[in-house]
């Protein structure tokens, strides 16, 4: 979870999206007519060819972002937890989206202002987290190198595009994933692309999207006052001896509890006793902030990122796209606060907090005979059925229709984000 995140370029023109979606729909209609391929029948997966894979993942296990208020309830976060496993070591370079110097990371500067009991900084990727990411990389290797000879066994920059939020734990998580995926073998330099904090879209940018900030302002605090959440929070805080005035909600409790559990550190008995309730109430709190019915809010939270994923799909489908403009694999290092709204918009959110090193994988296939396109989603390695799709193997036009409700082009995103600010200026504020 990015601290403060609940507070306060690549793109396809609309005409291109509309025409491609229409063509995909017309092709499906024609194939469903007498003499064509009957889409009511199951698709023969042996006739499907994998064309592209996109993976959105959360970083590995880390130290908490905000310690609990009482020192006797805090565990020790010692520097030994930061040991780098040898198998994860891999050199990489970080640039901005245009290939220039790495931008400044205000989040990392903020984390270094908080020293936890034991000496570690807040939000640091640990050895456990590195091993988790290496294991995820090995799973991807099994899927796309060994089981299906889709990717080269060594890293090839012509096959892989990598983007991460500009936060050190995510950059290092990406390193470990790549080490597992390619067994530390590479044919060219590994470049991880990042963006400025002011224009980052790999997480809901509450700080710089004014309209999103306005819509959600106060919701986190209000969530703790909701019936059920309020009573449960009081019960947990009293059990831990936390004063009612202390700014500790279920998001802070879950952040500490999850970090302690994954590192097998001795959590306080109250956290252990209420573990299930803490996770559920943290999810309830996040859903109160995001709100299913707030379509524009979800659009601003994850719409630009959906647009990037959509654009990658459309570039592969478009026969006019030069091979040099596409990659076989797109990797996006993100956060729990990215995955939650992403899963919501896809209709596959399981009401569980996205754990460390979790992945959402999107595969694009083409039928060898009918030339139709299909999307297959996996979350935590399990097949998913997106909203509006007949089954796990979803016709591309249906999938595009599902995400079109929330997708935002850069122009629309900036326009929607600035609405609250412009209205304020118009009112003389």
From Swiss-Prot:
Keywords annotated in UniProt: Hydrolase, Lipid metabolism, Mitochondrion, Phospholipid metabolism, Transit peptide
Enzyme class: hydrolase
Pfam families to which the protein is assigned, alphabetical: His_Phos_2
Residue span of region Substrate binding: 58-169
Position of the signal peptide: none
E.C. number: 3.1.3.2
Location(s), subcellular: Mitochondrion
CDD domains: HP_HAP_like
Cellular component, GO annotation: mitochondrion
Range annotated as the organelle transit peptide: 1-32
Any one GO molecular-function label of the UniProt entry: lysophosphatidic acid phosphatase activity
GO biological process: lysobisphosphatidic acid metabolic process
Matching PROSITE patterns: HIS_ACID_PHOSPHAT_1
InterPro entries linked to this entry: Acid_Pase_AS, His_Pase_clade-2, His_PPase_superfam, Histidine_acid_phosphatase
Reactions catalysed: a phosphate monoester + H2O = an alcohol + phosphate; 1-(9Z-octadecenoyl)-sn-glycero-3-phosphate + H2O = 1-(9Z-octadecenoyl)-sn-glycerol + phosphate
Annotated catalytic residues: 59, 336
Tissue-level expression: Detected in brain (at protein level).
Role summary: Hydrolyzes lysophosphatidic acid (LPA) containing a medium length fatty acid chain to the corresponding monoacylglycerol. Has highest activity with lysophosphatidic acid containing myristate (C14:0), monounsaturated oleate (C18:1) or palmitate (C16:0), and lower activity with C18:0 and C6:0 lysophosphatidic acid.
Quaternary structure note: Monomer.
Family, per entry: Belongs to the histidine acid phosphatase family.
Protein name: Lysophosphatidic acid phosphatase type 6
Organism (species): Bos taurus
Gene (UniProt): ACP6
């Amino acid at each position: 979870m990015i601290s403060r995140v609940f507070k306060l370029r690549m793109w396809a023109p609309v005409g291109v999206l509309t025409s491609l979606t229409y063509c995909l729909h017309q092709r499906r209609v024609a194939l469903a007519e007498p003499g064509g391929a009957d889409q009511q029948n199951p698709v023969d997966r042996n006739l499907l060819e994998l064309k592209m894979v996109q993976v959105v993942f959360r970083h590995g296990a880390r130290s908490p972002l905000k310690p609990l208020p009482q020192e006797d309830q805090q565990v020790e976060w010692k520097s030994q937890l930061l040991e780098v496993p040898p198998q994860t070591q891999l050199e990489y370079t970080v640039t901005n989206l245009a290939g220039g110097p790495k931008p400044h990371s205000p989040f990392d500067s903020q984390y270094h202002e908080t020293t936890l009991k034991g000496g570690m900084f807040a939000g640091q990727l640990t050895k456990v987290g590195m091993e988790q990411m290496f294991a995820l990389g090995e799973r991807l290797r099994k899927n796309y190198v060994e089981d299906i000879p889709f990717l080269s066994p060594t890293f090839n920059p012509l096959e892989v595009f990598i983007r991460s939020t500009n936060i050190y734990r995510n950059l290092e998580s990406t390193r470990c994933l790549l080490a597992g995926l390619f067994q530390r073998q590479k044919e060219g330099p590994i470049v991880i692309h990042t963006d400025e904090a002011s224009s980052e879209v790999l997480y809901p940018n509450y700080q710089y999207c004014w309209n999103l900030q306005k819509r959600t302002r106060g919701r986190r605090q209000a969530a703790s006052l909701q019936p059920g959440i309020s009573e449960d929070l009081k019960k947990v805080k009293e059990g831990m001896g936390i004063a009612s005035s202390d700014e500790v909600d279920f998001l802070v409790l879950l952040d500490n509890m999850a970090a302690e559990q994954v590192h097998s550190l001795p959590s306080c008995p109250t956290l252990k006793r209420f573990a299930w309730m803490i996770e559920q109430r943290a999810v309830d709190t996040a859903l109160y902030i995001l709100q299913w019915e707030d379509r524009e809010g979800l659009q601003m939270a994850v719409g630009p990122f959906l647009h990037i994923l959509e654009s990658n799909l459309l570039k592969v489908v478009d026969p006019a796209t030069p091979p040099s403009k596409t990659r076989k694999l797109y990797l996006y290092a993100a956060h729990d606060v990215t995955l939650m709204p992403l899963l919501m918009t896809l209709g596959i959110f399981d009401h569980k907090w996205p754990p460390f090193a979790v992945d959402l994988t999107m595969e694009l296939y083409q039928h060898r005979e009918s030339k139709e396109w299909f999307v297959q989603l996996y979350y935590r390695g399990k097949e998913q059925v997106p909203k509006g799709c007949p089954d796990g193997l979803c016709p591309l036009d249906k999938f595009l229709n599902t995400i079109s409700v929330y997708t935002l082009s850069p122009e629309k995103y900036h326009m929607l984000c600035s609405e609250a600010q412009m209205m304020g200026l118009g009112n003389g504020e």
